[in-house]
Protein backbone atom coordinates (compact mmCIF):
# COMPACT_ATOMS: atom_id res chain seq x y z
CA UNK A 1 0.00 0.00 0.00
CA UNK A 2 1.30 3.49 -0.89
CA UNK A 3 1.01 6.67 1.07
CA UNK A 4 -1.10 9.36 -0.60
CA UNK A 5 1.89 11.42 -1.68
CA UNK A 6 3.64 8.47 -3.25
CA UNK A 7 0.44 7.33 -4.95
CA UNK A 8 -0.18 10.78 -6.42
CA UNK A 9 3.37 10.95 -7.68
CA UNK A 10 2.96 7.52 -9.27
CA UNK A 11 -0.02 8.73 -11.29
CA UNK A 12 1.80 11.87 -12.44
CA UNK A 13 4.90 9.90 -13.37
CA UNK A 14 2.86 7.38 -15.32
CA UNK A 15 1.33 10.22 -17.32
CA UNK A 16 4.72 11.84 -17.94
CA UNK A 17 6.25 8.50 -18.89
CA UNK A 18 3.43 7.89 -21.36
CA UNK A 19 3.81 11.25 -23.02
CA UNK A 20 7.56 11.01 -23.53
CA UNK A 21 6.89 8.07 -25.85
CA UNK A 22 4.59 10.00 -28.18
CA UNK A 23 5.21 13.72 -27.66
CA UNK A 24 7.00 15.36 -30.58
CA UNK A 25 8.43 18.70 -29.55
CA UNK A 26 7.89 21.58 -31.95
CA UNK A 27 9.21 25.10 -32.01
CA UNK A 28 6.68 27.78 -31.25
CA UNK A 29 6.50 30.78 -33.61
CA UNK A 30 9.15 33.28 -32.65
CA UNK A 31 10.98 30.82 -30.43
CA UNK A 32 14.60 31.70 -29.74
CA UNK A 33 17.28 29.92 -31.74
CA UNK A 34 20.56 28.87 -30.19
CA UNK A 35 24.21 28.55 -31.12
CA UNK A 36 26.05 25.50 -29.82
CA UNK A 37 29.82 25.83 -29.44
CA UNK A 38 31.32 22.47 -28.58
CA UNK A 39 34.65 20.79 -28.05
CA UNK A 40 35.63 17.13 -28.19
CA UNK A 41 37.89 15.89 -25.40
CA UNK A 42 40.48 14.49 -25.93
CA UNK A 43 40.95 16.93 -28.78
CA UNK A 44 41.30 15.75 -32.35
CA UNK A 45 39.75 15.83 -35.79
CA UNK A 46 36.27 14.32 -36.04
CA UNK A 47 33.02 14.55 -37.92
CA UNK A 48 30.09 15.59 -35.73
CA UNK A 49 26.44 14.98 -36.60
CA UNK A 50 23.51 16.37 -34.67
CA UNK A 51 20.26 14.38 -34.82
CA UNK A 52 16.89 15.49 -33.51
CA UNK A 53 15.90 13.09 -30.72
CA UNK A 54 12.16 13.79 -30.85
CA UNK A 55 11.60 15.17 -34.35
CA UNK A 56 13.24 14.72 -37.77
CA UNK A 57 16.39 16.83 -38.05
CA UNK A 58 20.05 16.30 -38.81
CA UNK A 59 23.08 18.45 -39.57
CA UNK A 60 26.80 17.73 -39.74
CA UNK A 61 30.11 19.51 -39.45
CA UNK A 62 33.82 18.85 -38.92
CA UNK A 63 35.90 19.80 -35.91
CA UNK A 64 39.12 21.74 -36.16
CA UNK A 65 42.41 20.23 -34.99
CA UNK A 66 41.62 21.19 -31.39
CA UNK A 67 38.30 19.35 -31.49
CA UNK A 68 36.10 22.46 -31.65
CA UNK A 69 32.87 22.65 -33.61
CA UNK A 70 29.72 24.74 -33.75
CA UNK A 71 26.11 24.58 -34.87
CA UNK A 72 23.94 27.66 -35.33
CA UNK A 73 20.21 28.40 -35.43
CA UNK A 74 19.21 25.40 -33.34
CA UNK A 75 15.73 25.11 -31.89
CA UNK A 76 15.34 24.33 -28.20
CA UNK A 77 15.15 20.55 -28.15
CA UNK A 78 16.89 17.32 -27.22
CA UNK A 79 19.56 16.17 -29.66
CA UNK A 80 21.85 13.20 -30.15
CA UNK A 81 25.45 14.10 -30.94
CA UNK A 82 27.27 11.47 -33.00
CA UNK A 83 31.06 11.83 -33.10
CA UNK A 84 33.06 9.81 -35.62
CA UNK A 85 36.84 9.59 -35.44
CA UNK A 86 38.82 7.42 -37.88
CA UNK A 87 40.41 4.51 -36.10
CA UNK A 88 38.07 4.81 -33.09
CA UNK A 89 34.59 4.60 -34.57
CA UNK A 90 31.43 6.41 -33.52
CA UNK A 91 30.27 7.58 -30.09
CA UNK A 92 26.87 9.06 -29.27
CA UNK A 93 25.69 11.30 -26.45
CA UNK A 94 22.44 13.12 -25.71
CA UNK A 95 22.50 16.89 -25.21
CA UNK A 96 19.88 19.48 -24.33
CA UNK A 97 19.57 22.84 -26.06
CA UNK A 98 17.42 25.34 -24.21
CA UNK A 99 17.25 28.54 -22.15
CA UNK A 100 18.56 27.11 -18.87
CA UNK A 101 21.87 26.17 -20.50
CA UNK A 102 22.35 29.29 -22.66
CA UNK A 103 23.82 32.72 -21.95
CA UNK A 104 22.06 36.01 -22.65
CA UNK A 105 23.03 35.76 -26.31
CA UNK A 106 21.53 32.25 -26.66
CA UNK A 107 24.94 30.62 -26.85
CA UNK A 108 25.65 27.26 -25.25
CA UNK A 109 29.15 26.02 -24.43
CA UNK A 110 29.61 22.26 -24.37
CA UNK A 111 32.53 19.88 -23.82
CA UNK A 112 31.96 16.26 -24.83
CA UNK A 113 34.38 13.98 -23.00
CA UNK A 114 34.71 10.63 -24.72
CA UNK A 115 36.48 7.49 -23.54
CA UNK A 116 37.60 4.64 -25.76
CA UNK A 117 34.77 2.54 -24.32
CA UNK A 118 32.25 5.09 -25.64
CA UNK A 119 33.17 4.34 -29.25
CA UNK A 120 31.78 1.55 -31.39
CA UNK A 121 34.78 0.28 -33.41
CA UNK A 122 32.49 -1.68 -35.73
CA UNK A 123 31.23 1.62 -37.17
CA UNK A 124 34.78 2.41 -38.28
CA UNK A 125 35.02 -0.93 -40.07
CA UNK A 126 31.63 -0.40 -41.72
CA UNK A 127 32.72 2.95 -43.14
CA UNK A 128 35.66 1.28 -44.83
CA UNK A 129 33.70 -1.62 -46.31
CA UNK A 130 31.02 -1.69 -48.98
CA UNK A 131 28.64 -4.58 -49.60
CA UNK A 132 27.65 -5.77 -53.06
CA UNK A 133 24.12 -4.47 -52.41
CA UNK A 134 25.49 -1.02 -51.58
CA UNK A 135 27.65 -1.00 -54.70
CA UNK A 136 24.51 -1.61 -56.72
CA UNK A 137 22.80 1.55 -55.41
CA UNK A 138 22.63 3.99 -58.34
CA UNK A 139 24.07 7.47 -58.04
CA UNK A 140 20.62 9.00 -58.49
CA UNK A 141 19.38 7.23 -55.34
CA UNK A 142 22.42 8.41 -53.41
CA UNK A 143 21.69 11.97 -54.56
CA UNK A 144 18.13 11.61 -53.29
CA UNK A 145 19.49 10.44 -49.95
CA UNK A 146 21.86 13.42 -49.67
CA UNK A 147 19.09 15.81 -50.71
CA UNK A 148 16.95 14.34 -47.93
CA UNK A 149 19.68 15.11 -45.39
CA UNK A 150 19.73 18.73 -46.57
CA UNK A 151 15.93 18.83 -46.29
CA UNK A 152 16.09 17.59 -42.71
CA UNK A 153 18.65 20.28 -41.88
CA UNK A 154 16.07 22.84 -43.09
CA UNK A 155 13.26 21.09 -41.13
CA UNK A 156 11.49 20.25 -44.40
CA UNK A 157 10.28 16.80 -43.42
CA UNK A 158 7.86 16.36 -46.31
CA UNK A 159 10.57 17.04 -48.89
CA UNK A 160 12.98 14.70 -47.09
CA UNK A 161 10.44 11.91 -47.07
CA UNK A 162 9.74 12.34 -50.79
CA UNK A 163 13.45 12.18 -51.63
CA UNK A 164 13.88 9.06 -49.50
CA UNK A 165 10.83 7.36 -50.98
CA UNK A 166 12.22 8.05 -54.44
CA UNK A 167 15.59 6.66 -53.33
CA UNK A 168 14.08 3.33 -52.27
CA UNK A 169 12.00 3.19 -55.44
CA UNK A 170 15.24 3.43 -57.42
CA UNK A 171 17.13 1.13 -55.05
CA UNK A 172 14.92 -1.10 -52.85
CA UNK A 173 18.12 -2.51 -51.29
CA UNK A 174 19.03 0.94 -49.85
CA UNK A 175 18.88 -0.04 -46.16
CA UNK A 176 20.04 3.35 -44.88
CA UNK A 177 17.24 5.16 -46.69
CA UNK A 178 14.66 2.71 -45.31
CA UNK A 179 16.01 3.27 -41.79
CA UNK A 180 15.79 7.06 -42.14
CA UNK A 181 12.23 6.72 -43.46
CA UNK A 182 11.44 4.60 -40.40
CA UNK A 183 12.91 7.21 -38.09
CA UNK A 184 10.82 9.94 -39.70
CA UNK A 185 7.69 7.80 -39.35
CA UNK A 186 8.44 7.11 -35.68
CA UNK A 187 9.17 10.74 -34.83
CA UNK A 188 5.95 11.84 -36.55
CA UNK A 189 4.01 9.18 -34.60
CA UNK A 190 3.19 6.86 -37.50
CA UNK A 191 4.29 3.84 -35.51
CA UNK A 192 2.99 0.94 -37.65
CA UNK A 193 4.59 2.55 -40.71
CA UNK A 194 7.84 2.96 -38.78
CA UNK A 195 7.77 -0.74 -37.91
CA UNK A 196 7.31 -1.70 -41.58
CA UNK A 197 10.17 0.55 -42.69
CA UNK A 198 12.60 -0.68 -40.04
CA UNK A 199 11.76 -4.27 -40.99
CA UNK A 200 12.42 -3.45 -44.64
CA UNK A 201 15.78 -1.92 -43.71
CA UNK A 202 16.73 -5.07 -41.80
CA UNK A 203 15.56 -7.24 -44.67
CA UNK A 204 17.94 -5.42 -46.99
CA UNK A 205 20.83 -5.46 -44.50
CA UNK A 206 20.31 -8.06 -41.73
CA UNK A 207 23.61 -7.10 -40.08
CA UNK A 208 22.72 -3.41 -39.72
CA UNK A 209 22.47 -2.22 -36.12
CA UNK A 210 20.49 1.01 -36.49
CA UNK A 211 17.26 -0.53 -37.83
CA UNK A 212 17.60 -3.34 -35.28
CA UNK A 213 17.64 -1.05 -32.27
CA UNK A 214 15.03 1.23 -33.86
CA UNK A 215 12.73 -1.73 -34.44
CA UNK A 216 13.17 -2.63 -30.78
CA UNK A 217 11.94 0.81 -29.81
CA UNK A 218 8.84 0.85 -31.99
CA UNK A 219 7.89 -2.65 -30.83
CA UNK A 220 7.85 -1.38 -27.23
CA UNK A 221 5.71 1.57 -28.29
CA UNK A 222 3.29 -0.77 -30.09
CA UNK A 223 3.31 -3.06 -27.02
CA UNK A 224 4.50 -6.08 -29.02
CA UNK A 225 6.45 -7.14 -25.98
CA UNK A 226 7.50 -10.70 -26.81
CA UNK A 227 9.25 -9.63 -30.00
CA UNK A 228 10.45 -6.41 -28.37
CA UNK A 229 12.23 -8.51 -25.75
CA UNK A 230 13.91 -10.65 -28.39
CA UNK A 231 14.99 -7.67 -30.51
CA UNK A 232 16.22 -5.53 -27.61
CA UNK A 233 18.19 -8.42 -26.07
CA UNK A 234 19.84 -8.87 -29.47
CA UNK A 235 20.62 -5.15 -29.63
CA UNK A 236 22.22 -5.06 -26.17
CA UNK A 237 24.29 -8.13 -26.97
CA UNK A 238 25.44 -6.50 -30.21
CA UNK A 239 26.33 -3.18 -28.55
CA UNK A 240 26.47 -3.54 -24.76
CA UNK A 241 27.47 0.11 -24.33
CA UNK A 242 24.59 1.60 -26.30
CA UNK A 243 22.36 3.58 -23.95
CA UNK A 244 19.37 3.32 -26.30
CA UNK A 245 19.48 -0.47 -26.45
CA UNK A 246 19.83 -0.75 -22.68
CA UNK A 247 17.03 1.72 -22.03
CA UNK A 248 14.66 -0.02 -24.43
CA UNK A 249 15.41 -3.41 -22.90
CA UNK A 250 14.71 -1.90 -19.49
CA UNK A 251 11.42 -0.50 -20.78
CA UNK A 252 10.47 -3.89 -22.17
CA UNK A 253 11.09 -5.58 -18.83
CA UNK A 254 9.14 -2.77 -17.14
CA UNK A 255 6.12 -3.35 -19.37
CA UNK A 256 6.40 -7.10 -18.67
CA UNK A 257 6.37 -6.40 -14.94
CA UNK A 258 9.91 -7.77 -14.45
CA UNK A 259 11.14 -4.88 -12.35
CA UNK A 260 14.48 -6.30 -11.16
CA UNK A 261 15.61 -6.80 -14.75
CA UNK A 262 14.14 -3.43 -15.73
CA UNK A 263 16.18 -1.63 -13.06
CA UNK A 264 19.38 -3.36 -14.20
CA UNK A 265 19.14 -2.09 -17.76
CA UNK A 266 17.59 1.29 -17.01
CA UNK A 267 20.38 2.04 -14.54
CA UNK A 268 22.91 0.92 -17.14
CA UNK A 269 21.37 3.34 -19.67
CA UNK A 270 21.45 6.15 -17.11
CA UNK A 271 25.13 5.52 -16.40
CA UNK A 272 26.02 5.42 -20.10
CA UNK A 273 24.10 8.59 -21.03
CA UNK A 274 22.51 10.43 -18.08
CA UNK A 275 20.61 12.84 -20.35
CA UNK A 276 19.35 10.14 -22.71
CA UNK A 277 16.22 11.14 -24.60
CA UNK A 278 14.36 7.96 -23.58
CA UNK A 279 14.31 9.27 -19.98
CA UNK A 280 15.20 6.08 -18.09
CA UNK A 281 14.95 7.98 -14.80
CA UNK A 282 11.17 8.26 -15.15
CA UNK A 283 10.80 4.49 -15.41
CA UNK A 284 13.17 4.00 -12.49
CA UNK A 285 11.21 6.48 -10.39
CA UNK A 286 7.96 4.70 -11.10
CA UNK A 287 9.47 1.34 -10.12
CA UNK A 288 10.78 2.81 -6.86
CA UNK A 289 7.37 4.32 -6.12
CA UNK A 290 5.59 1.03 -6.74
CA UNK A 291 8.01 -0.53 -4.26
CA UNK A 292 7.41 2.24 -1.73
CA UNK A 293 11.01 3.50 -2.08
CA UNK A 294 10.20 7.20 -1.93
CA UNK A 295 13.75 8.44 -1.25
CA UNK A 296 15.12 6.49 -4.22
CA UNK A 297 12.36 7.85 -6.44
CA UNK A 298 13.19 11.41 -5.38
CA UNK A 299 16.88 10.80 -6.07
CA UNK A 300 16.40 9.66 -9.66
CA UNK A 301 13.90 12.46 -10.34
CA UNK A 302 16.46 15.00 -9.14
CA UNK A 303 19.00 13.38 -11.44
CA UNK A 304 16.52 13.69 -14.30
CA UNK A 305 15.96 17.41 -13.70
CA UNK A 306 19.70 18.01 -13.48
CA UNK A 307 20.02 16.82 -17.07
CA UNK A 308 16.67 18.15 -18.33
CA UNK A 309 16.24 21.55 -16.63
CA UNK A 310 13.82 22.80 -19.31
CA UNK A 311 11.55 19.76 -19.22
CA UNK A 312 7.95 21.00 -19.73
CA UNK A 313 6.67 19.34 -16.53
CA UNK A 314 9.68 20.30 -14.40
CA UNK A 315 7.65 22.27 -11.84
CA UNK A 316 5.23 19.38 -11.29
CA UNK A 317 8.19 17.08 -10.83
CA UNK A 318 9.82 19.40 -8.30
CA UNK A 319 6.62 19.41 -6.25
CA UNK A 320 6.57 15.61 -6.43
CA UNK A 321 10.13 15.50 -5.14
CA UNK A 322 9.22 17.70 -2.16
CA UNK A 323 6.29 15.39 -1.33
CA UNK A 324 8.49 12.32 -1.62
CA UNK A 325 11.06 13.82 0.75
CA UNK A 326 8.45 14.42 3.47
Located regions from the model:
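Short, ordered, surface-exposed loop/turn motifs in non-cytosolic proteins
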Residues: 34, 41-54, 126-128, 142
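Alpha-helical segment of the N-proximal tetratricopeptide repeat
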Residues: 133-176, 180-183, 187-193
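Structural signature of tandem alpha-helical TPR/SEL1-like repeats
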Residues: 153-165, 187-200, 221-234, 256-268, ...
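Short, acidic Ser/Thr/Gly-rich low-complexity loop/linker segments typical of extracellular
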Residues: 54-68
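Helix-start (N-cap) detector for alpha-helical repeat units in TPR-like alpha-solenoids
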Residues: 141, 175-176, 209-210, 243-244, ...
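Canonical tetratricopeptide repeat
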Residues: 146, 180, 214, 248, ...
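A short, solvent-exposed beta-strand micro-motif common in secreted/extracellular proteins
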Residues: 77-87
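Structured interaction patches on ligand/partner-binding surfaces of diverse proteins
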Residues: 61, 86-109
Amino acid sequence: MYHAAAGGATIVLAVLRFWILILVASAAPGQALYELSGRISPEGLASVTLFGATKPFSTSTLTDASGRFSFKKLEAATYTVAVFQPGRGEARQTIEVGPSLADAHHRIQLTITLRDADFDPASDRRRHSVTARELAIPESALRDYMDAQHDLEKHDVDAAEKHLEHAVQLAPQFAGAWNTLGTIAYQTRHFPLAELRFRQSLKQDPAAYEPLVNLGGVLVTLHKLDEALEVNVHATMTRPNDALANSQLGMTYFELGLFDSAVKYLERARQLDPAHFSHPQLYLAEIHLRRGEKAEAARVLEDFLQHHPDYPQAEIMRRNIVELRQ
